[in-house]
Amino acid sequence: MNFNFRPIVFEDWEVLLKWRNDPVVRMNSHNSDLIEEEMHKTYIKKLLKEKDRKQYIFSVDDKEVGTIREDELGHANELSYIISPDEYGKKLGELMIRLFLYNKQGRFYCEIKKDNIASIKAAERSGFTVIDTKGEMIYYSLDKR
């Protein structure tokens, strides 16, 4: 199997919007609203200009299966990720996180809704530990030195 991360380009807006508007993804996102096409295109244009926010497409054997975003927060880098709905149940979230972090150092952070069992398992199997819970959110951290 071949694995690849590549930075997103504007032309990825369509697949990213499709994944983001999937009902399961929406339910597990901070903002569960249906995202409109023009709003999403504007978001992608802005994201591509930001220096402290990077997003990648993850491919397995040349098939795009997910995306991971890394936001530099100063004290830590926050990760957020989506697996293509066509790929659910294959443990690709865990694989994507592990491979993404393989050569990285520092503190990493993610926020996951308590009902998002697949993302919880992916984060915990990737070495993240719970640092706090508030309301419907679980906060995770991973220190890689």
Named regions from a protein language model:
Residues 1-15, 19, 59-145:
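Acyl-donor (CoA/ACP) binding surface of acyl/acetyltransferases
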Residues 22-25, 34, 49, 88:
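Residue-level marker of structural boundaries
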Residues 24-44:
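Conserved GNAT-fold acetyl-CoA-binding loop/helix
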Residues 32-33, 56, 139:
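Sparse recognition of residues in long alpha-helices and their boundaries
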Residues 45-57:
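A short helix-loop-beta-strand connector motif used in the catalytic cores of GNAT acetyltransferases and
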